[in-house]
């Protein structure tokens, strides 16, 4: 919950949850009529365990994340801890098992669990660092591969520049 009456969600809540941001209005559609499907906890837990075993996050990605962590510490004075990395090691394999790619899972996770901490900073102070960070992400992970992170960073920068930004 983050609305007009709740100005901030604590780190503890974010660290234990996976936020879903709904920034755009959905398209109207007619859903297909499908029957209910019961899934109990043990079955879902089994699927998660299989996903983690079959799709572990690569050492290459973990190395890039460590380099990124050091960059963020140096330029923004924000660090993320072992709990975040442990959560990422569970989230990304499940993301891959659901049909996504590893880099897209890392991108989604970082944008929602790490970069959201930038909102707590004085954006006037960090605004000049954002372009360098976007370049770093493109250099480290591949041009345009960290699209969620880059979109978030540019939106943050432009909102505080007084510009309205529309990113497609």
Regions found by a protein language model. Give the residues of each.
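C-terminal regulatory/interaction module of P-loop NTP-utilizing enzymes
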Residues: 1-168
């Amino acid at each position: 919950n983050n609305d007009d009456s709740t100005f901030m969600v604590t780190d503890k809540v974010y660290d234990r949850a996976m936020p879903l941001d709904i920034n755009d209005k959905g398209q109207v559609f007619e859903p297909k009529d499908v029957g209910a499907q019961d899934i109990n906890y043990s079955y879902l837990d089994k699927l998660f365990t299989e996903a983690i075993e079959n799709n572990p996050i690569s050492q290459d990605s973990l190395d890039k994340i460590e380099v990124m962590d050091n960059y963020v510490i140096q330029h923004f004075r924000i660090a993320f801890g072992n709990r975040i990395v442990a959560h990422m090691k569970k989230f990304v394999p499940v993301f891959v098992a659901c049909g996504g790619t590893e880099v897209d899972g890392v991108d989604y996770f970082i944008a929602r669990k790490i970069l959201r901490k930038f909102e707590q900073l004085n954006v006037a102070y960090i605004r000049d660092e954002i372009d360098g960070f976007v370049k770093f992400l493109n250099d480290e992970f591949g041009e345009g591969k960290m699209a969620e992170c880059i979109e978030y960073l540019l939106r943050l920068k432009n909102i505080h520049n007084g510009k309205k930004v529309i990113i497609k």
